[in-house]
């Protein structure tokens, strides 16, 4: 039986490239979505040559609603089996000092575009009652609040909350559609440079994170946390008084940005 398309946003770098390689290896035809055309074309050429799979490229800035709608229009006629909502970014700094344009752009990418694509994919998948939707969140989405990276933490909390709610709705409907979220800690990608952070802990490789996530997705794990240390940290945090926990997070965030705030 032929496989449907796997759509990957944020496919031009980091986790997106690793997701694309893994799913191409599994034999899935791909739709690669990102802003950087040259990188997408280079990746397409590499994947087609290495894995002999169909690979479509769509250059899109999904922070813009019109681009997101245009992307959905292009995907409507394709047999969709997997959606990986991977596009996203973060920024550090005190809330009162970060640029409002960047804040809203982050909300548009991390929340609005993800929400639109997820709803489109789910409605399309419901026609055959099968498919996979993996939302890339962060361990930040499992933590109550993140001072000095407040907007980013809030967007990822939205992703984890939405994902778990929709997953439960599907379970109660006895649907075969999978909806889950990936919540990694530090990963070695260009995210760190864009967000202007330096993690105290060594990050895991993007390749390991992507492969682990795909394995867990096919195993139908709803909340995917790749590392034991992050699982333990999140679990331990639940037993702390909320205000104390948030102070600890604030202290760690200030270390990441070199106590610049």
Model-derived features: positions:
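Conserved glycine-rich cofactor-binding loop
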Residues: 12-13
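Active-site helix of classical SDR
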Residues: 118, 155
């Amino acid at each position: 039986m032929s496989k449907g398309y796997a759509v990957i946003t944020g496919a031009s770098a980091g986790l997106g490239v690793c997701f694309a390689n893994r799913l191409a290896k599994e034999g899935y035809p791909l739709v690669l979505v990102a802003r950087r055309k040259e990188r997408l074309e280079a990746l397409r050429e590499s994947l087609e040559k290495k894995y002999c799979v169909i690979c479509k490229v769509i250059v899109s800035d999904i922070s813009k609603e019109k681009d997101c709608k245009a992307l959905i229009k292009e995907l409507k006629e394709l047999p969709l089996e997997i959606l990986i909502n991977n596009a996203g970014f973060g920024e550090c700094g005190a809330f009162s000092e970060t640029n409002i344009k960047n804040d809203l752009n982050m909300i548009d990418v991390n929340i609005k575009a993800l929400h639109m694509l997820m709803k489109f994919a789910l409605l399309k998948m419901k026609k055959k009652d099968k498919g996979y939707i993996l939302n890339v969140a962060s361990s930040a989405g499992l933590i109550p609040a993140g001072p000095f990276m407040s907007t980013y933490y809030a967007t990822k909390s939205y992703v984890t909350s939405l994902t778990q709610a929709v997953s439960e709705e599907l379970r109660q409907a006895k649907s075969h559609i999978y909806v889950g979220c990936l919540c990694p800690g530090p990963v070695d990608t260009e995210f760190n440079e864009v967000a202007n952070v330096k993690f105290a802990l060594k990050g895991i490789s993007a390749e390991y994170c992507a492969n682990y996530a795909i394995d867990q997705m096919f195993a139908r794990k709803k909340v995917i946390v790749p590392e034991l240390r992050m699982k333990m940290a999140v679990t331990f945090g639940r037993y702390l008084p909320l205000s104390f926990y948030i102070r600890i997070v604030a202290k760690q965030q200030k270390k990441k940005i070199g106590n610049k705030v």
